[in-house]
């Protein structure tokens, strides 16, 4: 009965960026297999002191990228989801590697780590990769600014060797 309820609920819910997802689906893109998060703890990168910039998918923070990807036949629904991590350790390691490759990463994806809980009413997630990363597709009513809190500044680390 519980599985039936989840399927019924998922069919009734609309994703926050459903219009854009539908457009990509019409162009032949596909949604990945999605799962209920079941109140899992998660973390993601965020901007300290700029809540309005947090929890915005890549295609919405850079609409030109979406148009370019579509024009080049490289549209991807994943870029309408939020990148999340299953543990702070895996998120910090991922960020450290990004900082080594991209010196301005803090201004692109954030300077801090935010943590919160993802409920089944918030949306659906992809399978968690071995590096802890997964995509989270928010439902319309989801507002992670209310449930996620910044827990750590990531740019104060003194582990870079320039």
Show where each model-derived region lies.
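Low-complexity, intrinsically disordered/propeptide-like segments
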Residues: 27-30, 34-37, 116, 121, ...
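Generic surface-pattern signal
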Residues: 61, 96, 100-103, 156, ...
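ADP-ribosyltransferase catalytic core
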Residues: 69-141
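Low-complexity, flexible helical/coil segments
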Residues: 62, 78-83, 120-122, 149-158
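Amphipathic alpha-helical interaction segments
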Residues: 53, 60, 67, 93, ...
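Short, surface-exposed beta-strand/loop "edge" segments at domain boundaries and coil↔beta transitions
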Residues: 48-59, 120-127, 145
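ADP-ribose/NAD+-binding catalytic cleft of ART/PARP-like enzymes
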Residues: 1-76, 162
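Charged phosphate-binding loop/patch that engages nucleotide di/tri-phosphates or the phosphate backbone
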Residues: 136-162
